[in-house]
């Protein structure tokens, strides 16, 4: 049995990148001491997803000025921590980019190698993220762990509201999707995450901010794709709860474990997922002419 342990760092954000670096590395040390294979931060840890008035161009300029480079001391500190602690780290930050910064996550493996870099594609242009540039590609990477290789992908917060995000990652071969988050997480969004896991046969781990953050309420999640017991003696199978963990509202480090062997067995034998798709009928899904303009979109102002 290969149990992959993930630390969900549901932590109170810091006022700046330097403070976030110090408290974040300390959290990684605690996670490693408790046997975690991956430490996952909430969305945009470098500035705590600092909300600002998107109608105030001056506030927007200040917000964008807080962006950090992928080779900055902030990011490198987590690369160094991953190597020192023999634990993968998924660190999130407002990334320097032209013409506007990006909302990004970088995953370093336990040897300190950068294996995945993803920038949020579905940015919230109706609020503070109107000061961001969207990413342009979903990707999957092989993460080497103490239990062997795992195919991982990432989507960030609002990405999970679109079924295409998880489906693309599934088509690329993801077994586990890491989801940094920064918003109030309710029952609807929880069920949405369960649906993403079920329909794509992927495991999901999501870290949110606690209720000490203006945009958080905890409720970090771990969701298994295994919705049915595949018992060969029972042709009807048996329903299985997929919500493995839903945390409380306060700050803390929470842990979840995924049985990789069981997930892989399920992926090979359950009918859901990508095997029986009929993509020749899905043309409308990529017809951008059908996308309506959100009339209150501030991105049309800035």
What are these model-predicted stretches?
Residues 1-7:
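Extreme N-terminal starter segment of soluble prokaryotic enzymes
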Residues 10-17:
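Short polar catalytic/cofactor-binding loops
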Residues 17-18, 22, 26-111, 115-117, ...:
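Cys-nucleophile CN-hydrolase/nitrilase-fold catalytic domain and related Cys-dependent amidase chemistry
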Residues 67-89, 160-255:
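CN hydrolase (nitrilase-like) catalytic-core segments centered on the catalytic cysteine
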Residues 80, 96-175, 180-181, 185-195, ...:
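Active-site catalytic loop in hydrolytic enzyme cores
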Residues 108-109, 143, 223-225, 256:
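Short beta-strand-to-turn element immediately C-terminal to the catalytic PLP-Schiff-base lysine
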Residues 120-133, 251-266:
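A short, polar/charged loop-to-alpha-helix boundary motif
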Residues 253-302:
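A short C-terminal boundary segment appended to hydrolase-like catalytic domains
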């Amino acid at each position: 049995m290969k149990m992959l342990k993930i630390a969900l760092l549901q932590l109170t954000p810091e006022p700046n990148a330097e403070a976030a670096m110090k408290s974040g590395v300390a959290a990684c040390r605690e996670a490693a001491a408790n046997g975690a294979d991956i430490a996952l931060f909430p969305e945009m840890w470098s500035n705590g997803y600092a909300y600002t008035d998107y109608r105030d161009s001056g506030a927007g300029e200040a917000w964008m000025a807080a962006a950090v480079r992928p080779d900055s001391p902030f990011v490198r500190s987590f690369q160094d921590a991953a190597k020192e602690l023999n634990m993968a780290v998924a660190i999130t930050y407002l990334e320097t980019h032209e013409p506007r910064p990006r909302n990004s996550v970088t995953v370093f493996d336990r040897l300190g190698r950068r294996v995945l870099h993803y920038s949020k594609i579905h940015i919230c242009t109706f609020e503070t993220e109107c000061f961001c540039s969207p990413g342009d590609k979903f990707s999957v990477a092989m993460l080497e762990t103490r239990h062997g290789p795992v195919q991982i992908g990432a989507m960030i917060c609002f990405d999970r509201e679109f079924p295409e995000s998880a489906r693309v990652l599934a088509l690329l071969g993801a077994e586990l999707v890491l989801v940094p988050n920064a918003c109030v997480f309710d029952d609807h969004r929880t069920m949405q995450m369960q649906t993403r896991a079920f329909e794509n046969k992927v495991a999901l781990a999501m870290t949110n901010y606690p209720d000490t953050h203006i945009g958080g309420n905890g409720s970090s999640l771990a969701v298994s794709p295994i919705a049915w017991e595949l018992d060969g003696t029972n042709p009807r199978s048996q329903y299985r709860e997929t919500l493995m963990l839903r945390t409380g509202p306060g700050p803390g480090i929470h842990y979840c474990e995924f049985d990789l062997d069981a997930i892989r067995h399920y992926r090979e034998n359950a009918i859901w997922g990508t095997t029986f798709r009929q993509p020749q009928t899905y043309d409308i899904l990529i017809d951008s002419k059908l996308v309506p303009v959100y009339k209150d979109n501030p991105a049309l102002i800035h």
